[in-house]
Each structure stands twice: as C-alpha cells, then as structure tokens.
Amino acid sequence: MTWLEIVVLALIQGLTEFLPISSSAHLILPSEVWGWQDQGLAFDVAVHVGTLLAVMVYFRADIFNLLNGWIKQITGGGASQESRLAWAVILGTIPACVAGLLLDSWIEENLRSALVIALTTIGFGVLLGMADRKEGTRDIDQFTLKDALIIGVSQALALIPGTSRSGITMTSALFLGLNRDTAARFSFLLSIPLIAAAGLFKGLELADTGTSSQWSEIAGATLISAVSAYACIHLFLKFLQKIGFMPFVIYRMLLGAGLLVWLYVA
C-alpha cells in the first residue's frame, strides 16, 4: 500500500465507523471503483485498534462506571443503573457475534459487492429516515434488556456490507422510542466489544498467516483512524440533536444512487 492509500483508508475508517453510513462499504468502494488492492489483514487490525482506542478513550468514564457497577453486582452487591446497562451491552453483543461466526465467510464470498452496497445503503437509509421521524422521548433510565436484545439482533444485519452497524442499531433504538442521544450513546457503547472481538479475530488470523508488515504503516493507520474517529464521535454527539439523522439519510440516498448509476455505466 502507498501512503496515500493508507491515509485515505484510515481516514475513511475513522470517519465512518461511528457514523450511520457504513465503514465497511466505504472501505470496499476504493477497490471496486478505483481498483485499489485489498488493504490486507494488517491494515484491518490497525484501523480496528485505532477506532477501538478512540471510543474507549471518549467513553472512559462510562466504561469505568459500567464495569464498576457490573463487578459490584456479580460479587454480591445490589443492581444499579450501571450494572443494568453493562448487562444490556453484553446481551446486545451476543447476536452479532453468533451471526458473525456462522455467516461471515458466506457473506464475504457472496455479498461483498458494489451492487449490494448500493441497495443496502439506500434501503437502510430509508429506514433510518423513518425512524428519525418517529424519535421518542425515552432516555437511558428507561432502557430495558428487551431493548438491548432487539437492538443486538438488528446489529447482526450490519454483517451485510452497506448496512452500517451504527446506523442499524440507532435505527432500531429510535423505532423503540428512545431519544437520539440515548440511541447514539448505546450504539457507541455496543460497538466496543464488537470492534474488540473483530480486531482480535483478525489479529489471530494475521498471526496464523505469518505475514510481515511495515510497522510504520501500521502505526500510521492506527493513529489516523484513532484521531479521526475520536473527533467524529465528539462532533456527532455535539450536533446530533440540532441536525438529526436526515443529513446522513440524504448522503446514503446520493451514495446509493451514484453507485447504481456507476454500475449501469460501467
């Protein structure tokens, strides 16, 4: 990979991982549209580590409180809002992990294409727009384990390129009557174990291949994806209540339509 490709792809990962527009779709597109070579496992691991660091640093206080509440409960203490939310994150993670283990290889072989990305980008964009119009008023205090399970099941759909993990989880949360801030924050917290698991899986796969890598390139990709992801999370949460999800819906419509036109012309 050239440094231009590293910078562009790491920025794409960092800026799209937590926005409802699908990071996997945007990482596939350069190879489909520009003919860039696949970035490889080492790069995938690097940008996963970068985005994981970003979300963990940003939500470090929340993570500490959730872990503290969860540990207190399982060691004999009483239940709390923090322990309940920790269980919600655990419960919401299970469906996507199971689906990933069972279906990831099949999806990679059969659904990793520009046409699938175009259709899912448009289809799930429409759902996000409908959900945003239905935004509820429930906050984190009214969040239930049933909500977590439903959102977790929907998260499994993000294995399909173009769906967007953050997009589908926020869509489900909004349909359940949660407000925008709660939908976004739970989606970000829910991303932590999944990104960690994906990074670990790819890391083990990389170790098995014995592929040598340029550490400067890995460090650069990690740093760029981490900084851009952190900035993206901060700005997204800052402006979400003002702008809602419609700018992302419009972007998805334009991207999907543009891809369909490109496929037709090509």
From Swiss-Prot:
The chain crosses the membrane at residues 1-21, 39-59, 87-107, 111-131, 143-163, 186-206, 217-237, 243-263. Its main location: membrane. GO terms for molecular function: undecaprenyl-diphosphatase activity. It comes from the Bacteria. It holds the Pfam family BacA. It catalyses: di-trans,octa-cis-undecaprenyl diphosphate + H2O = di-trans,octa-cis-undecaprenyl phosphate + phosphate + H(+). Bacitracin is thought to be involved in the inhibition of peptidoglycan synthesis by sequestering undecaprenyl diphosphate, thereby reducing the pool of lipid carrier available. Catalyzes the dephosphorylation of undecaprenyl diphosphate (UPP). Confers resistance to bacitracin. This is Undecaprenyl-diphosphatase. It comes from Hahella chejuensis (strain KCTC 2396).
